[in-house]
């Protein structure tokens, strides 16, 4: 096994082409067997096995900077860069991250998790090296899906417009990994031949000589040779937007053919042309394993599985997820209300909107990885008396904050935000945790914020949201399952800002916001043994919250605790400010405590352990209440 002797990229340098191909086969098998034990993102990594081998064979990481966009596809890269023996700990507590991470390895020069950041980061690294001795390659590997985000094109536009002096001892190389063939198909052997020719030293030398000569000509004369060069290359290679943005374009290249990939990368490495380069490669997501596991999302994320049969070991549960409840109930509402439309940013199945899409394919819009556009697109729809429901993960909604403020809140447009994966998300760690949505929405005028404590409450809140026509509103709910026996025919509409008392008690009042209520209920059961019987309130609304109820509670309770699975600055902060502003803390000698996510980024772990690290689990709640009542 060649892979047994490969621990770092330097171990690849002495391999011949036959050995490199064998290494790729072994690396693919290692990736499959590793993910089979842990679950994780499989398809993207299998699609870049040959590319990973070629990049580490040709370039000199970490001296050369290699940045993987998103990071889903970085598993083979991790195996080749000193983490082979830890790969079966990926996405496990105290194990490797499922994404690239600077603190994990010097071979991960830039952390990822969200998409479309790689070109900007690589360009920043390239520009920062201006004037330094040596020659550096800064390589961004980005998928065609990530290219749908505006940020990627902002970076391309900036990179192509920069003066050549910024690239004197640097090279910016963008590798567009087209694994869905959504941009352009390769045209076979002739395309590969042209790509090798276009990257060759002789071609680029002639091109650079011509370029220098053209720049010395008067514009009136020089414009014709410039046009001729572009026209000639367009004829042979196919003109495209990347050339227009100032990149030298090579492609489309077979991303699984090392006989083609390696020479092209070597040509680029050895050439000193200052132009930024974009290499367009075609790969197959799930390469070598798609025929075993049949998956609509091309093995994007899988549970633990049998590597021989592809059977996934998913726990069988009859309980629906919050995402499923959302998708089903929205479909029911849409049956009687043709104004309802749904919007997702490349996550139809993750958000439950695949259910809606089956019923109403003409009333759902998947805008791609373009959260900013999604929000303003929804704002425009609402101007025309449509009811847009924007379903986005909490962590990705962060990317559209200016649009939420400027295009929705200020104009008081009734866009409905359905915020999935709110709170801790487990194995995907800090980059995907839904930590900040309460805090970044609660300070916006005109917004109504809701959070269900269970699946049936989500049904009621969707009913309620459909009746909110004068304000924007948001419903946040967690990753995971809710209770059985959801009554989807429930038509109850909640009174805006009205909380619900779950249990009447004395001395201690617990004000819970969202699904964290289940931990509160578990804590209250434990407190019975200690003769402590708190009042438990499901707040339902963080904005506006039930001030009348709060005012009554402070009169006959000595301790008030708020709890939410969100960052500091959320519901608890607003409530504490209110109580102090109204003078109620001093008047009733009230003891206050706000429980929320700890003020640090928590690495991947189980959702339960992450809650425990923030003192949001039942045992921690019990301990805190005991201390406050002594």
Predicted features along the sequence, with ranges:
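Short alpha-helical segments and helix-capping/turn motifs at coil-helix boundaries
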Residues: 36, 48-57, 121-126, 150-167, ...
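Thiamine diphosphate
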Residues: 81-83, 89-121, 131-135, 162-298, ...
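Helix-enriched interaction subdomains in cytosolic or periplasmic regions
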Residues: 304-308, 442-487
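Glycine- and acidic
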Residues: 8-13, 32-40, 104-111, 246-251, ...
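Extended, hydrophobic alpha-helical segments in both membrane/secreted and soluble proteins
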Residues: 138, 142-159, 352, 364, ...
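Long, structured ligand/cofactor-binding scaffold of large enzymes
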Residues: 29-131, 157
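N-terminal amphipathic, basic-rich helices that act as targeting or association modules
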Residues: 1-79, 243-261, 275, 280-283
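A short, small-residue-rich loop immediately preceding and capping a beta-strand
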Residues: 38-40, 64-67, 110-111, 133-149, ...
């Amino acid at each position: 096994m060649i892979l047994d002797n490969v621990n770092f990229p330097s171990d690849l340098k002495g391999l011949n082409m036959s050995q490199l191909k064998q290494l790729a086969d072994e690396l693919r098998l290692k990736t499959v067997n590793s993910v089979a034990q842990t679950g994780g993102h499989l398809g993207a990594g299998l699609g870049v096995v040959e590319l990973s081998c070629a990049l580490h064979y040709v370039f000199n990481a970490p001296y050369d900077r290699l940045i993987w966009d998103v990071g889903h596809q970085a598993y083979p890269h991790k195996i080749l860069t000193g983490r082979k023996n830890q790969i079966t700990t990926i996405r496990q507590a105290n194990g490797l991250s499922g994404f690239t991470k600077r603190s994990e390895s010097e071979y991960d020069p830039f952390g990822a998790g969200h998409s479309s950041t790689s070109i900007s980061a690589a360009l920043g690294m390239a520009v920062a090296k201006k004037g330094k001795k040596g020659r550096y390659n800064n390589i961004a590997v980005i998928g065609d899906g990530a290219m749908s985000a505006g940020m990627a094109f902002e970076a391309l536009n900036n990179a192509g417009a920069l003066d050549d002096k910024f690239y004197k001892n640097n090279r910016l190389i963008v590798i567009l990994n087209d694994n869905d063939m959504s941009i352009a198909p390769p045209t076979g052997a002739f395309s590969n031949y042209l790509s090798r020719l276009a990257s060759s030293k002789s071609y680029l030398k002639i091109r650079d000589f011509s370029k220098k000569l053209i720049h010395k000509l008067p514009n009136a004369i020089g414009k014709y040779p410039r046009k001729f060069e572009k026209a000639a290359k367009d004829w042979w290679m196919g003109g495209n937007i990347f050339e227009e943005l100032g990149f030298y374009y090579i492609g489309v290249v077979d991303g699984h053919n090392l006989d083609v990939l390696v020479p092209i990368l070597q040509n680029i490495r050895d050439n000193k042309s200052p132009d930024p380069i974009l290499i367009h490669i075609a790969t197959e997501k799930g390469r070598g394993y798609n025929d075993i596991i049949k998956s609509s999302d091309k093995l994007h994320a899988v549970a633990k599985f049998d590597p021989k049969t592809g059977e996934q070991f998913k726990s069988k549960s009859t309980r629906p997820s919050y995402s499923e409840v959302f998708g089903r109930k929205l479909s029911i509402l849409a049956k009687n209300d043709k104004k309802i439309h749904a919007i997702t940013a490349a996550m139809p199945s993750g958000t439950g909107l695949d259910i809606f899409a089956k019923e109403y394919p003409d009333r759902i819009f998947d805008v791609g990885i373009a959260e900013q556009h999604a929000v303003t697109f929804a704002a425009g729809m609402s101007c025309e008396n449509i009811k847009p429901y924007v379903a986005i993960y909490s962590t990705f909604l962060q990317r559209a904050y200016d649009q939420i403020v400027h295009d929705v809140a200020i104009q008081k447009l009734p866009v409905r935000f359905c915020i999935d994966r709110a709170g801790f998300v487990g194995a995907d760690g800090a980059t995907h945790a839904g930590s900040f949505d309460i805090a970044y929405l609660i300070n916006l005028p005109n917004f109504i914020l809701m959070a269900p404590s269970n699946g049936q409450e989500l049904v009621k809140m969707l009913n309620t949201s459909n009746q909110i026509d004068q304000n924007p509103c948001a419903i946040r709910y967690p990753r995971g399952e809710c209770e059985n026996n959801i009554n989807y025919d429930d038509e109850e509409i909640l009174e805006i800002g009205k909380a619900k008392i779950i249990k009447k008690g004395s001395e201690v009042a617990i004000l819970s916001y969202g699904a964290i209520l289940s931990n509160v209920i578990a804590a209250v059961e434990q407190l019975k043994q200690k003769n402590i019987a708190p009042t438990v309130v499901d707040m339902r609304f963080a904005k506006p919250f039930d001030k009348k109820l709060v005012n009554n509670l402070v009169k006959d309770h000595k301790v008030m605790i708020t709890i939410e699975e969100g960052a500091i600055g959320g519901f608890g902060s607003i409530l504490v400010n209110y109580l102090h502003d109204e003078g109620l803390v001093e008047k009733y000698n009230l003891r206050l405590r706000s429980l929320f996510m700890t003020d640090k980024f928590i690495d991947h772990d189980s959702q339960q352990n992450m809650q425990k690290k923030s003192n949001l689990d039942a045992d921690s709640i019990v301990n805190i209440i005991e201390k406050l009542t002594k």
